Regions:
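Active-site-proximal alpha-helix that buttresses catalytic centers in soluble enzyme cores
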Residues: 1-305
């Protein structure tokens, strides 16, 4: 029996099937050059029972997506004197420098602008470590939010399935943290989500007073009768109380945060790969010289024959 026949079962979001073999096969994953820097996931929270499982699962996805990558998670200082056993970004950067390793590529675990980014950039600059952009806006984030809405019964799994869901929302407030800058950036992901859902989507900041309420009111002015909240939040970057308070004060149902969604891990891996330094010109020149020498020797052998 399919899940569509089970009342209350979440509908799976349709994803593209595997590509055909031969010339249409899926491109191979790029290999990580030897000696490449590690991926340092910068978590905007202290290590704890809420943040640690999400972070560990995401890093597991990254390693499964890209064999050979070295990963580590750096948290904010927790004030427990290191009792949690988890290290901070500063400690990991210091360890890499003292060991003579390349400065790791720092990937912030946030979907958009966040208050902890300026300090992170300052800290990384002290060690010469590159910091990537935030993960969003990106279509994979819109996909993840769509999945969470579907799991909560607040959206169709895809537009091709036209049967009705009694609790489906007719408008969505895409909530995030990071103030107005984060809400503005989330608007782009909101446009991608609106195209998937075929309902209006308005972005709002959970940490900006009145932002969510204004977004809900705007949707109702547009004719929405059953608006819902959809967190553009991975998890560690937002206080759980902000999410609960927004749902309670707005009177709107809410989907779950993105959490350790598979596509978020894939996005982390691709963000890291894009930031890897290019092969050193000297190494490339040496390889070219070696290839040219091999070709010259081969040509000489053919001439002798």
């Amino acid at each position: 029996m399919s899940t569509a026949a089970i009342p209350g079962a979440p509908l799976p979001v349709r994803t593209p099937g595997s590509r055909a073999r031969g010339r249409h096969r899926r491109p191979e994953r790029p290999e990580i050059p030897a000696g490449s820097p590690a991926l340092l996931l910068a978590v905007p929270a202290a290590a704890g029972p809420e943040s640690r499982p999400v972070v560990e699962e995401l890093l597991s996805i990254v390693r499964s997506e890209q064999n050979g990558v070295r990963t580590a998670a750096g948290y904010l200082p927790s004030g427990d004197g290191g009792a949690s056993g988890e290290r901070t970004v500063a400690e990991l950067l210091t360890e890499a420098a003292e060991a003579g390793l390349p400065a790791p590529v720092v990937v912030p675990l946030v979907p958009g602008p966040h208050d902890f980014l300026p300090e992170l950039h300052r800290l990384a600059a002290e060690y010469g470590a590159p910091v990537t952009d935030a993960l969003g806006p990106h279509p994979l984030l819109a996909e993840g939010v769509h999945v969470r809405l579907s799991e909560a019964g607040l959206a169709r799994a895809d537009r091709a399935r036209l049967f009705a869901i009694a609790t489906a929302a007719d408008g969505v407030v895409l909530t995030t943290v990071g103030g107005q800058a984060a809400a503005d950036a989330a608007g782009i992901t909101g446009m991608l989500l609106a195209a998937r859902l075929a309902v209006p989507v308005v972005a709002a900041a959970l940490d900006l007073p009145g932002s969510v309420a204004d977004a809900v009111a705007h949707l109702k002015e547009m004719g929405a009768q059953n608006p819902a909240l959809a967190p553009l939040v991975i998890g560690p970057e937002a206080d759980a109380e902000l999410l609960a308070t927004a749902a309670e004060e707005s009177g709107c149902p809410s989907a779950a945060p993105l959490g350790a969604y598979q596509a978020v891990g894939q996005l982390l891996a691709s963000t890291y790969l894009a930031a890897l330094p290019a092969v050193a010109p000297e190494a490339g020149a040496d390889e070219s010289d070696a290839d040219e020498a091999d070709g010259t020797r081969a040509g000489g052998r053919h001439a002798a024959q």
